[in-house]
Every structure is written in structure tokens, then in C-alpha cells.
Amino acid sequence: MNISIITVGKLKEKYLKQGIAEYTKRLSAYAKVQEIEVSDEKAPEHLSEADMLLVKQKEGERILAKISPDTHVIALAIKGKQRTSEEFARELDQLATYGKSKIAFVIGGSLGLSDDVMKRADDTISFSKMTFPHQLMKLVLCEQIYRAYRINRNEPYHK
């Protein structure tokens, strides 16, 4: 399976880079993982609603440019569907079973994802109703993908 993790903005924190590198290394035994970073829009702190939409639209265009038509897209969003690790593992397994060999997980910037990206998404997922930095969510996502592969192969892993 080919998994792309598309994020807005460049990851700067060393500790997050190290964690993500560790999980992508572990995942290499199960899938080909590609990290794609698209540039974020520079924006002042206090934006109008119209400016926020414009920022999300520009970032969304960059995201969509990285997704091929045959890719199954899963957007990370607060209002996405919450799952247990076991449910997430089952869904990844079903995607592989039904021939979905390309999956892209999309993590938006600080303002979230554009409507166009959400419309392109085949599915949404939420890890919590809480708000987290999008850079941290990339690490959490990598860990959960790795956990899903371990679950699907009945291999031991932390509970």
C-alpha cells in the first residue's frame, strides 16, 4: 500500500521530526509512506472571515495538487468520525482488500481544511474533539497507522 501524509506547513520541531521518522521507519515493513508538506499561507493574527476562507482556499489548492484522481483521501478534521484503533485498523484493511492501494491522509493548517479539500475527501477522521497543533497530529497519525498494521497482523504492540 502507498500512503501519503499531506500536511500544511514545514515541520520544525526536532522532537516531532524524530518521532515521525521512527514511525515511518517502522511502517516501511508494511507500506510505502511518503510525507508531503505544502507551504502554509502567511497570515496576520486577526483575520476576517473572508481572509480565513482565502487562506484555507490557497492552502487547499496546494493540497489538491498533490492528490491523484485514484487516491483514497482521508481528511483529519475535528468534526470527522471518531474511531477506536481497532476500527481504524479494520478500515485500512478493508481499503487494501478492495484494491485501494493509494491512500492520502490530509492534515490542514492552523485554520483547518478548505471546503474543496473536504469535498474531495472520501472519509474523515477525528482523533479527538480537542484542538491539537497540526504538527503533533502528524506524529499521532503515524503512530495510529503503525498500530493499525500491527493489529491487522495480530502482532504484539502496547495497549
Swiss-Prot record:
Principal location listed in the UniProt entry: cytoplasm
Annotated GO MF terms: rRNA (pseudouridine-N3-)-methyltransferase activity
Binding sites annotated in the UniProt record for S-adenosyl-L-methionine: 76, 108, 127-132
Keywords carried by this UniProt record: Cytoplasm, Methyltransferase, rRNA processing, S-adenosyl-L-methionine, Transferase
SUPFAM superfamilies named among the record's database cross-references: alpha/beta knot
Location of the protein in the cell: Cytoplasm
Cellular component, GO annotation: cytoplasm
Its EC number(s): 2.1.1.177
Catalytic activities: pseudouridine(1915) in 23S rRNA + S-adenosyl-L-methionine = N(3)-methylpseudouridine(1915) in 23S rRNA + S-adenosyl-L-homocysteine + H(+)
A Pfam family the protein falls into: SPOUT_MTase
Role of this protein: Specifically methylates the pseudouridine at position 1915 (m3Psi1915) in 23S rRNA.
Family assignment from sequence similarity: Belongs to the RNA methyltransferase RlmH family.
Subunit structure: Homodimer.
Annotated PANTHER family: METHYLTRANSFERASE, RIBOSOMAL RNA LARGE SUBUNIT METHYLTRANSFERASE H
Protein name: Ribosomal RNA large subunit methyltransferase H
Gene name of the record: rlmH
